[in-house]
Amino acid sequence: MQNSSKYQCYATLCANLLSLCYGAFAGWPSAAFLLFQSADSPFEGGPLTTNEISWIGSILCIGGLLGNLFFGWLSDKLGRKLPMLLAVLPMLISWILIILAKNAVYLIFARFLGGFAGGAIFILVPLYVTEISEDRIRGSLGSCLILFWNLGMLLAFISGNYMSYNTSPYIYIGLIIVFLILFMFLPESPIYLMKSRKEMEAEKSLRYYRNLRKISQPPEGFKTEMEKLKCEYIEEKSGSDDTALSWSDFNNPVARRVIVIGIALMALNQFCGCFAMVNYTATIFEISGSSLSPNMSAIIVGIIQLVGSYVSTLLVERAGRKLLLIVSAFGTGFGHISLGMFCYLKVLGCNVESFKWVPIASFSLVIFAASWGVLTLPFMMLTEITPVKIRSLTVSFCMVTLWIFAFILVKYFPIVAAILELHGCLFIFAACCFSGALFVLIFVPETKGKSLESILAFIEERTKK
């Protein structure tokens, strides 16, 4: 680790404690739902119905959508830091409701509030990390969002297997408190401060994140970076008497191109089918002849996801974002096709006994390939390609589309799977993956090692062609 990146890495780790807690919140139902639908259900009314389970699962997406809208607006008004601290409140309340839950209503409210906090996390953490990072490590730090999210899910799978459903929340409440204590002392993003015309505070913040607080004469690299921020600030200030957003800021070729790319990346993130397929983990292990319990199967999937997202942090500044996305999408698509062919041949009555290894191998490929690219990189790339002035609202809007896509998948995937069967859904997911890879190849710019200014200049140049 170079000395200048010390506090950037520290701040990224602190911010992503929220990602870890939200990953645990998202993974918590994996083991809990099995208990809630069994004869040993701890609730007064007995086992939860399929409809109640459906709403407990899908209400998270509605909360996330509203959280995106609210915190996207708030991040333009109050910055990145304060809204991240405020996002702790709904997350804390959601875990407390789970501890106190007596029926499905408690859990529905808890999942809504947790989703609301998740909406904040998926917009604020990428914004914050992108704006404090040097170009050379921005990709590695940005990919930590999903790495910590997957770590949280794995912790939830493990704790759900060995602890009661209302005991593990105490662990995550403790982690949230640790986040509060550590993060409240970090400075605001220097880019947001400069955008808010607080030049002295912006320089102080940039000095902190470049580990230059105690150096009276900073190196030329720092001076150059500070001048770039000033130029951007002066250009915005002199270009208009009012820095408030207007429709023209969004209704121009560059903004429209960025928004289309953002929505496409969010669609690829969801319709690659990885999240939907996690619900079929136990089924896939069963048709492979595995005797593992559903909980142990989930833990194995969690480990594969974690390793895949860690690979992303290692390769993103070496191979580049674009290549990783394309290879990830193709790998995920091929995994879906091979698993779909196995399931289809089994439906036709073919003898597949000698190919029982295919489901687990294919499923592992889907999870692993998706975790190093299509699940990890879209959030970081969205913040990299978006102009500073419209960044908060554009990222918020694209994240809203993500939650809409997620809600559609969670709510209606079981219905479509019942009609088309599993193999039909897998072939659709494969088509989405290959289409997404082609879109990335043609339209998405490479951002590896480039400054945010040069990325936008490249997009403007491509838009004019």
Question: Which ranges hold each PLM region?
Answer:
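Alpha-helical transmembrane bundle of multi-pass membrane proteins
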Residues: M1-R207, E236-K465
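Short intracellular "coupling" helices and adjacent cytoplasmic loop segments at the cytosolic face
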Residues: Y209-T224
